């Protein structure tokens, strides 16, 4: 049948066409091409007599720890922590809005017995009873809500670092309390936040709220070494508003010149604008299931002014280290679920590749002393509605992270037509408010930025900063150092592959089911699979050879040699004393067949992965043991053939990549079964196992011993109509034993009869399989 194509690929995937090998070397290998560098041509290296360079700065980059500043009175800025370094006992600071908020913090040294002390707060002499029986300093937060009331101690901070913090944010005043090194934050609400002022009696620092994790670190562990040196003198707070005027900083400075080469220090201010890309894939069926919500790379092009020069910039934003979340509202077809949605958190990284058309990027090949400094940015998620057919729509909303510059390297950025040497800026993250939730579900108050709507309606996020580097460039400014060739060739192919994948996926809805079943019954071989392509016979033969060569490197081809040993290991490692109920996924004793037998004991806990791996190996066993019935690979190959015929003209360079990819990705959720007398044992890639009788379709205990014996000796059958569908069909329509047996054996004629009768349950199952044929 149609899966003959995969068996033929497995058999013939080691034939090689010399022309294809040479072409592959030209497209996938890279080679450095340089201009003649004069006397340095003998060594084939760039000059090694590096000179020194200088780095000027211009764009203001917000410091993490700004200060110290002298004691003063001012209105605290919104979204900034004021970190006060108390150096004596007494009043640390006073803050009020003259209406409903009066607070003062007093410091009490260690080992103080209960005593009444006089303090001057808000111009009044007040007597507070204080006590400190610990080895650390205590900071008592005294509060009153009216000028007529008396102060009372609302919170206490016990600290050995002698640091106190206050933040104005979100209509509240936030402070620290508890004991170092495990302090917490708490807030006070007041009606008139705009008129609040603070009188600080000690030196202090200012930290942006985006760096709150650093502020916590300072409160718990003390300030870093530099601010504690005696050479740092506190400045007046007014120094923050001084406008610095500097000489031109966006400039190129020649450091040294040798023969045809020179070294230049390149300094640039930059504005980085980027956006996140995402992909939302909905499963087939009744419309209540989503397959995945994931991040993907996104390009953005824009213009901005730099010292009067119009700059055209191009950025590519990508994400690494995502966290996979899921939501399952139940197992019914009408229960809402999301199989996987990606969230970026503290352990994730965001990469932004930046290039512009200025002179700085013309010769960015031999580079040293690359440095950069960038501001931080907060990215807040928006809402995405899961439009289910009936009922109130679940909505994923919220989530935020702050991006902090963590490093810069050289990179190669690809556009549709050219590859560009660019700078890759790496950003670490801290989670921020608000949290995200999926409304009308149990998923609430989680932190991070989900991929559903990461841009929140914004066209882009923006970061400003600067970078500098020392580059080795030709002395003649009209020359340009060539970058690696042939990279663009491969990138153009990737772009064509992406377009073809999208076209293939969109065609799934257009496949006629009766046509698919008829095609799946044909013995599709290598020639007939590609004969529909508008090309000559010679091109078809060449394409078949290229497909074989690509298929040789696929996971399916490399796994076939390990299949026998893996199944043997799995069978021998099963427990010999356990019988289990089939509808409970956590009872499987199969080991992960991809591991050595010596790792059996350690891998018993990974149940879903183990059963999933076994089912993948069952596919290989089925593929090399043809049976009478139709297989899942018959459907997969038929869909592939249909899409090839329906698609726009396909290039001979793209199809060889598509076919192996289809063999791996089409129908990822597969079920396989083994028959023994009147009993069926079924296992799927999601880790579920079932055992049931053919006559009644009633479940029986899943016998691991029996399955271990059968798996190496009995034929493996694709469960095209899986157990859940069979059960649903029997409960709603009633089927005879002969019909049940034919459906269990995937008899193609019986399947076609049910489809011709427009049986909704069978049609829905086949439609779901077709919709799973995506790249």
Swiss-Prot record:
- Keyword set includes Magnesium: no
Where is the motif DGE motif annotated in this sequence?
307-309
Give the matching HAMAP family: Rota_A_VP4 (MF_04132), Rota_VP4 (MF_04125)
Q: List the disulfide bonds.
A: 317-379
Gene3D superfamilies xref list: 1.20.5.170, 2.60.120.200
Give the protein's recorded name: Outer capsid protein VP4
UniProt-annotated stretches for the region Spike foot? 509-775
Its ancestry begins with: Viruses, Riboviria, Orthornavirae, Duplornaviricota, Resentoviricetes
- Positions of the UniProt region annotated as Spike head: 65-223
- Gene source species: Rotavirus A (strain RVA/Human/Japan/MO/1982/G3P1A[8]) (RV-A)
Q: Where is this site: Cleavage?
A: 230-231, 240-241, 246-247
Its family? Belongs to the rotavirus VP4 family.
